[in-house]
Amino acid sequence: MVAVMQTDMGETENSAVRPKVTDAKGILKQNRQFLDYFWDIAKPDRQIRLKAIEDLINYLKNSEQADELKYTLKRLVDGLSHTREDARSGYSVALAQLLSVFEEISLKSTLNSVKEKHNLLTASKKLIRNAVFGNFFGVLALSQSTRLHKEPQVMLECVQLLQSLSEYREHLRDLPRKTMVDILSETSQDVFEEVLFSALQSDLTSALKSPEQLELLLVALQKFPSVLKPKKLKKLLGTTAVITKQNMPRLVEVLKTAARSVKKENILPAVALDLLQVSLREDNFEMFWTDAIITGMMSEMPGPTHYLSFRLLGASLPLLSIPQLQFVLSGDVMRQYGEHTMSAQMPDRFKFAPEMAGYVGEFMQSCTDPDKQLVVVLGFTQLTNQGNPVVPSYWKALENMHPSAVQRYVDWLIEAFCKPQLENCLDFSTRRQKGNQEAAVESESCVSRFRKWIIPRLTFIVENQQIKKQEALVMKVVRFIFFHAFFEVKKPTSEIPETTQALSVPINQQTRTAVVSGFYSLLQALNSMMVLGESVEVQGLNFRRIVGVQADGSMWIYSVFQFASMLLNQNKYVKSLQSFSPEQRQGWDSVLESVEALRKKAKTASSPEHTAFQQLFLLIGIQMFTSPEESLDLLKDLQTCMEKAQAKKSKKKKATDEPHWVEVIVEILLSLVSQPSRLVRSVCKTVFGRICPHLTQAALSSILNVLDPNKDEDESGVVVTDDKKRKLKEEDEDDDDEEEDDDNDEGDDDDDDDDEEEGGEEGEESSDSSDDEEEDEAMEEGQEVDQNFRLELMKVLQGQNALATEEDGSDDEELDDAAMMKLDGSLASLFLEQRKKIQAKKDEKDRLNKEKGLVRDFKIKVLDMVEVFLSKQGFSPLVLGMVEPLLSVIENGMSSESSQPEQDYLRRVADIFRNRLCRGKFYCKEIDGREAELHEMLERLIGRAQKLTDSSVALYYFSAALYVLKVLRGSVVDQELSTMGKVEVERATTCLKNALTSFMTKRKSPLTGAMFIDLFHRFPVLCVNLMDTALENITAGLRDHQQGQACFIMLKALQCKHVKNLMTGEQTTELYKKVVDQLTKSLENVQCKNKTAHDKVVKALELCLHVVKIVLNQKMRVNLELLQDVLASMNAEGCLEKTGKLEDTYWSVMRLFGVIKPKMEKVKKVPEAEQTEETTKKKKGFLPETKKRKNRKKPTILEGKETETPVEKTPEGASGEGKKNKNKKKNKKRKQQAGEETQDQPTPKKAKMQQQQQQKQKKKKKKKGADGE
């Protein structure tokens, strides 16, 4: 082998052959493994480095050779100066581990080796950086070996070396100082006093010059306070303490330097926090905070110094006492933080608020003192921007508050709402606000902003499940918000605690609207809140996921309703903002009576419908405070509905009678769900889930009619009208919203008045800006609008005699000034009228779009009810009536071009249909008497699927058909696969056979092969009946695609184990004979002329592979000779000897017949003629062939003509290059000849380029001829 390799490499035949190297003892392999560890230690991947270090240490532990340990130490010391950072750190960690495990290695000798290998004095300028890193990482390894404190002299040398490395700051930055701090933190007091203090004295003396040196002093002070006593500190710094007036300017400069050094890292320098701790120990915190932070750091422009102050504020919270916290949280640092938070709202600006929230969250989590927690939360709450607190109402930092602190905080919020004391807040205005405001900010607006912030904060405390609270606290918040949303105090009374807290400033309408909104948001949270408490009963309720109730089982909304009833009966002390008429008040009392009656019945015999009626009564009753008229109508319907439901139960009518109360309650739910309220939507969804078992076909039809696309026009008008009426009533109640709308309308009217009366610059600009809109609208409406407007314009001009005619020969100069003014007025009014018409059309279009959006939103809410019904009552026979309506929605939506919201709605419908209905866990099993109806539905679904044009829609119809088949078959175990339940097998087979035939013979069929494969897997009995049809179409299919799909379907059918179990041995053998015959016919004279034919052959070969394998393994009596001959003829010309899916499948089949794919013989390149010295010798003045510019653009060959390619003589020495050029020319010539058939004439641009290329070639020929001479 070696001799052959030498011959191939061109060596002489007489050269000596090396003896074969043997490694019988495995020494080479062992050494290779050992050396690989060092390669892995230097790799960038951290996990690989750590694994290599661990393996190296284990290898050395088990090794018996001392030389390997020495080599490892030398190799690791050498690697400390590696050019890559990852490699340096890897070698350093490995060296630290080595020194830690093998204590026989001397630290002294190791340090000497590091100094000797990476000598800073003898290193060149180019290598000084590597030497610096080598020394530093060597010391770092020694410090991490956990042995350094045992050898003080080595520690001293390490510290001295680190001091010398501090000069190379451009390479190491502050790493030497940090390492010295780490060494100090692990040093005992005796070693520090006896050994290190003298060495570090120079650094400690200059501690106020840099952050690193100051950090060294602060760590020494913290670790060795008995050594660095005031007397020694006096010698070092000149003062007996660090925090003094004398040292303050230098401390400020050090802090500024530290702030700038971490500008990119966004972290708090350790020296700042250590300084703060020193100030606390020296009892000089207020002086440090005032002089160093507020006066020194905050005097700078906003930037790194401010951010350091903010971080120090957040980090200091766990360290401070309550007076110190109050001092810090009411100072200038907090004010500056507030200004930064408000001015950093722009997207590209740095935002510190998330970082501060993290500091506060960590403090709240670690602090166990409720008083401190309350002080911090109040400090951030009282940081206000013109009355509006800076922190958001929804603040996750409150999640770890102590329950007692939460109680006191809620009391403070309630008191602040009633009697705001903004003078106690740390209020500020940003620079932009100061510049924009002409006068002082009104106190009432500040109070309004503060109150509108308090309500969401109270709501958040109740909503957040992580905040620990009691039911009494929740009820207190609910009562407070409800009272101030809908009532006013006439006279305080102790019976109503809410009346005892008088309002120092009356609540304006804008604030009242916010309180109402907050109440409904709170009610929504209560409706979905888990039971509060830690008792066993509470845990049982939470385990059953019962929400919206208190520990005693009563609903939260019922407690609110009781409180409201009590307030309505206390007319002497409180006044309702919503005055009720006698009829409305009677309706309220009837609600209370109905609810009490339902509660009594629920105690004796609880049922879901009782709870559903209670929720509806209470919800509609509460809504009487916002929309009494609509609520009263709903209450009457609901009352009648409940009476009929009870009457039906008492009379015990037959089950065939339709319970009308369900239909009424569904209509009420549909009416309620049209309102844009999360609370109403949630309650309606819950109530509908409870009445699902009683739902009837008529009630379900009323829900499906909403989704019916054919009834959009009728239903949308009702929904939009109801919604608009409700909105108008809300706007009548909300004066503030009215004012804003009026302002906008007045602004619009003013613009119109300016256009009509002044006709000045603004009118001209607006008319100019609307010209494009007029033209666009005119183009959309067609030419008729333009003609009408043109006629009107002609009439105006003719009426003023301003239109020149051929008869009178008049012109514009005949009009006097008065006529011209009159003409201008007429034209202005005409154009204004035209613009109003265009605007009216645009408004109408916007109105229609808005109506469509409202209808779509309403349908999405109704889909919630459909989803709830399918989830809870998937086994109900009513589900069968939902199949075709949902399919109608899907088909209509996919057949029309729709916007993104419409597509989202359609996607929701399709998801519910596919996952909740067709693939639902439960399905209808009670179909007695409905078999004929279901078979007709099956035929309709399959027939409709064949008539569609979109395969995606057909897939939903086909899935629905499979669902109907599943319902008809019922539940079947694997042992009873031959039974099909109540399916009429012949009828179903005929229907599906027609569909399969249509798929195989129709040119553009919406059906796909995947549909039938799914059918075959789920219903093996039908698969057996349809296999003959699929088998016939292997050759009878309309196109290659259908024939390939037939092969694929047959392959999946034969692979199905359930199909095998349904067939006898003789049937299976006969089937395989037919398959072989069909495959033989299909593969005769096959040609892969396009991709479709190619795919068909691939699928046919895959079927062949399965069939041949089964026939041979089971030794069936099936003749495979004809198939083998056909397969052999496919490769008669050797065209299937390449690689590819088709070729690989083909040879897999042939391998079963014992035919192995022939190996491709590599054709060796013909040896080129030997170059003579004359031809290889370069002539002077000639460029080599590799340097010559190639002309890549070849002229285009005209049709019917041939161009002679110029033959360039190349020197023999460049024969390889010449051969490559020849191959390229051949390829280009083939492409040109292929293009002759389709190319008629060259474009002018190509012709011009051809002339230029021909001229260049002529010049080259001339130049070569001259050179040759």
From Swiss-Prot:
- Compositional bias (Basic residues): 1177-1195, 1221-1232, 1256-1269
**What keywords would UniProt list here?**
Activator, Biological rhythms, Nucleus, Phosphoprotein, Repressor, Transcription, Transcription regulation
Where Phosphoserine occurs, residue numbers? 810
Q: List all Acidic residues biased stretches.
A: 731-783
Q: Name one GO biological process term.
A: rhythmic process
Q: Biased-composition ranges for Basic and acidic residues?
A: 721-730, 1199-1211
InterPro entries this protein is in?
Answer: ARM-type_fold (IPR016024), DNA_pol_V/MYBBP1A (IPR007015)
Cellular-component GO terms for this entry: nucleolus
Which coarse location class applies to the principal site listed for this UniProt protein?
Answer: nucleus
Q: Name one Pfam family in it.
A: DNA_pol_phi
Region listing for Disordered, in residue ranges: 708-783, 1163-1269
Localization per record: Nucleus, Nucleolus
Q: Quote one Gene Ontology molecular function term.
A: sequence-specific DNA binding
Q: Which family does it belong to?
A: Belongs to the MYBBP1A family.
The record's listing under PANTHER family reads: MYB-BINDING PROTEIN 1A, MYB-BINDING PROTEIN 1A FAMILY MEMBER
Task of the protein: May activate or repress transcription via interactions with sequence specific DNA-binding proteins. May play a role in the repression of the circadian clock gene expression.
> Under which name does UniProt file this protein?
Myb-binding protein 1A-like protein
Q: Which organism is it from?
A: Danio rerio (Zebrafish)
The encoding gene is mybbp1a
